[in-house]
Amino acid sequence: MGLAIPVDRQLVHNRKIQCQGFIRADGNFDIEAELIDSKTYDFPSDTHGVVKSDSPYHHMKIRLTVDLNLTVLDAAAVTLTGPYHICPKGAGNITNLIGLKIGPGWKRRVQTAIGGPTGCTHLTELTGPMATTAYQTIGGEISRQQRAATASDNLPDTHQNDSLKNTCIAYAQTEI
């Protein structure tokens, strides 16, 4: 069951974010994210004339290559569509993420590395869901490989992972 609709309403804005995780032939992982913003109506743009209904006015992509330790080995980004002519330049500092490790403090380090007046707010924001996608991709792949190696369908007890302790209700440590 979904959310109840509280009142009559009309959709005016769509933001689509898709993240995907890939294992590479070299054993590293590519984490890719895409953001697309569109409106449900035509609107004027100083730099693009009229932006048509359902046409993207933000469309960005990022790829981070990470190792098993979640260290960024390579980074690439592109702004395919932005509201201003300068927007594509905001992807230019994405390589500042190389060498950073996904983990506690990731958002702060990303903001320092690629945010602010030389970066792009939307690309910076995309790195948050990319981090959780990296965790899901790598953790799932490690478990899958362990099951294949032992020919077992038993899932490992993820509650044993200390890095997840108290990160959400499922991993809350109860007092005895």
Where are these regions (language model features)?
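Active-site- and interface-proximal helix/loop "cap" or "latch" segments in soluble metabolic
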Residues: 14, 21-23, 35-176
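N-terminal, Lys/Arg-enriched amphipathic/low-complexity engagement segments
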Residues: 1-3, 7-12, 16-17, 21-24
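A short hydrophobic beta-strand element
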Residues: 27-35
